[in-house]
Amino acid sequence: ILNKYCKFLPVEIKFGTKTDKIDDPKGKKDDKDNIIKIDKVSDNIINNTKPAWTKKPSNLKDEHYKSFYKELYPMEMSDPLFHIHLNVDFPFNLTGILYFPKLKNNLEVQKNKINLYSNQVFITDNVENIVPDFLTLLHGVIDSPDIPLNVSRSYLQADGNVKKISSHITKKVAGKLSNMFKKDRKDFEQKWEDIKASHKPNCWGRK
């Protein structure tokens, strides 16, 4: 429960203590002239107060995004195909990182992998009424204080900010795909098999 709801809270959460082995600060050595190890007891902080999506995109490298992906999905073996960093403060507030995963055969298990936060407080992993249907296979995090905490379908569909955020996410994904195509068409074509799969109607259970 703590990991799900408090993983990225902006204040540190201490849960007991942890013990690490460190070199003796006084430089004491053993019989083999090696610096001895001593125990260092410190607070066990269980949350990440500064997750990648709260940082400026210019301060992050590709390996940082991949590392955060592994932090979100430690059981995911494959690296994502690409990522999109959301960072908007007008006319609505929206931050986050969305990843396009390497799709598995069973597309259904890939859903509900986008977590919604409000100021780093977890709200829900059901974003079907916030993120367009054809993008719900994306993974990642979106954080916005402008999305109402009442996440009922009818309430979200009527909210103006939600509509703007949904449209913005769609444009960002389209822009990313366009840039990928223009920048490195060969690489884009290699990833296209995974990308186009998410647009098949059967992915959403519709016939």
What are these regions (language model features)?
Residues 1-207:
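Conserved GHKL (Bergerat-fold) ATPase module
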